[in-house]
């Protein structure tokens, strides 16, 4: 089994990328430089191939301890098969990083330069400075927004050995053979579960953007304490509200500050907010229309993307804004590109303006979030989409989608049964955009999962 190592200076996002690959939090992530001191290792699966992923200690020369970590890390690199060199796209590349990257180039191992924290167009422009590394393979990513990760995975996938067991192939063949034309077999819970449960809606945002005022307006009573003092809400506040015979459970989460200011009880509250979002269906991402949008707003919105939630962007304090709505909407679309599927509504929580529209939006998005798309319609769509825009070849070989079926709800998860499971991220984006034009998917993410047909050889 091949070994893939993540390497770079402290605080460039190695541990966050490690956690993103693994799918759960194993490595501790922090803004404190050098949080990872020992290497973390685990077996992961990229599409249908397995590898050992290694999160190295940060390379820094600021202390004796880090000198020991550096020596250990360099030893790990020599024993690995694939190297991901991570840099921070928010800062100009350093000479030390360039020297280190060039030294790894001499190892004759697959080496990629991964530029993290590319969260905006300004960051993309700055990333051109990294051309100086002379990297053959270079990727711009945003771990916090889950942007560009699939492209890195596809690059790694091509370098891994085929190690699919006979049992794995047989199990997937059994799974496909049990799907009827309507795609009846789905993961864990069927649609009746979602019809009968309350819709859980998390209210998230920076401190003092009006989350508690919004909760009070939505449930029509003073359930949460409202104050001009930032960070009044520490404990989550739950309140049920029935609309059109459907129970909606609103949760007002603790306001989130910049990481450097989080300590003690607020750190506990932040952790609890993330655990709450794991259980939510929809997030109301609250922005303050009277202030410029910040990087912290982006990071908080990234939580909604991280937990694959339905999203409504709520532009609060609209009565205090003098800007044109269309212009503000464009700013939001540019800044929160990773939530392009989320509808935007302007409200005044304290004044109660346009609050009533949020209930209908929640019900609409929840229906989209939990819907089942007929397999026959999915396959008709795939046939038309691939005919209009053929799938790019992989290493000169044709890539085909044999069959598509929905295998999960909340959000919709679509299995694409293929001869080769390397689906470029840009083509995946194309399919998702086309799906949004053909199906009712407003406000919900869509997850496409390439799967290899058991016991089939790659077709030419």
Curated annotation (Swiss-Prot):
Ranges where the EngA-type G domain occurs: 2-164, 199-370
Single Gene Ontology BP annotation: ribosome biogenesis
Residues that, per the record, bind GTP 2: 205-212, 252-256, 316-319
Keywords: GTP-binding, Nucleotide-binding, Repeat, Ribosome biogenesis
Annotated GO MF terms: GTP binding; ribosome binding
Residue ranges of domain KH-like in the record: 371-454
Record-listed GTP 1 binding positions: 8-15, 55-59, 116-119
Pfam families reported in the protein's UniProt record: KH_dom-like (PF14714), MMR_HSR1 (PF01926)
Keyword Amino-acid biosynthesis found: no
Assigned protein family: Belongs to the TRAFAC class TrmE-Era-EngA-EngB-Septin-like GTPase superfamily. EngA (Der) GTPase family.
Quaternary state and interactors: Associates with the 50S ribosomal subunit.
Record-linked HAMAP family: GTPase_Der
Annotated function: GTPase that plays an essential role in the late steps of ribosome biogenesis.
Protein name, as recorded: GTPase Der
Gene behind the chain: der
């Amino acid at each position: 089994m091949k070994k893939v190592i993540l390497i770079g200076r402290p605080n460039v996002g190695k541990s966050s990328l490690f956690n993103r690959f693994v799918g759960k939090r194993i490595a501790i992530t922090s803004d404190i430089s050098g949080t990872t001191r020992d290497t973390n290792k685990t077996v992961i699966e990229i599409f249908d191939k397995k590898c050992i992923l290694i999160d190295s200690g940060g390379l820094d020369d600021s202390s004796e301890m880090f000198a020991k970590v550096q020596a250990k890390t360099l030893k790990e690199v020599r024993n690995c098969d694939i190297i991901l060199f991570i840099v921070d796209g928010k800062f100009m590349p350093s000479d030390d990083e360039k020297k280190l990257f060039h030294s790894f180039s001499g190892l004759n191992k697959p080496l990629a330069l991964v530029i993290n924290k590319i969260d905006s167009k300004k960051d993309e422009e700055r990333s051109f400075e990294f051309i100086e590394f002379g990297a053959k393979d270079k990727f711009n990513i945003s771990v916090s927004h889950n942007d560009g990760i699939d492209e890195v995975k596809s690059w790694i996938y091509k370098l891994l050995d085929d190690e699919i067991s006979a049992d794995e192939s047989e199990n997937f063949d059994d799974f496909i053979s049990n799907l009827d034309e309507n795609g009846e077999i789905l993961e864990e819970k069927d649609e009746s579960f979602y019809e009968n449960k309350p819709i859980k809606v998390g209210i998230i945002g920076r401190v003092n953007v009006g989350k508690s005022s919004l909760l009070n307006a939505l449930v029509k009573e003073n359930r949460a304490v409202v104050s001009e003092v930032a960070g009044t809400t520490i404990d989550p506040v739950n309140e049920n509200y029935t609309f059109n015979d459907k129970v909606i459970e609103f949760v007002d989460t603790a306001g989130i500050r910049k990481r450097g200011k989080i300590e003690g009880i607020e750190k506990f509250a932040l952790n609890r907010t993330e655990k709450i979002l794991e259980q939510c269906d929809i997030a109301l991402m609250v922005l303050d229309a009277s202030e410029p949008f910040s990087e912290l707003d982006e990071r908080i919105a990234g939580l909604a993307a991280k937990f694959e939630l339905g999203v409504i962007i709520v532009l609060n304090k609209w009565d205090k804004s003098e800007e044109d709505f269309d212009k503000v909407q464009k700013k939001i679309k540019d800044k929160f590109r990773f939530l392009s599927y989320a509808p935007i509504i302007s409200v005044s929580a304290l004044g109660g303006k346009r609050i009533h529209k949020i209930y209908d939006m929640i019900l609409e998005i929840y229906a989209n979030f939990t819907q089942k798309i007929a397999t026959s319609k999915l396959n008709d769509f795939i046939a038309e989409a691939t005919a209009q825009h053929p799938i790019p070849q992989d290493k000169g070989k044709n890539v085909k989608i044999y069959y598509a079926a929905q295998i999960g709800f909340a959000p919709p998860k679509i299995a694409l049964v293929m001869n080769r499971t390397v689906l470029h991220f840009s083509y995946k984006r194309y399919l998702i955009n086309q799906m949004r034009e053909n199906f009712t998917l407003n406000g919900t993410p869509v997850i496409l999962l390439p799967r290899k047909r058991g016991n089939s050889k790659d077709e030419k």
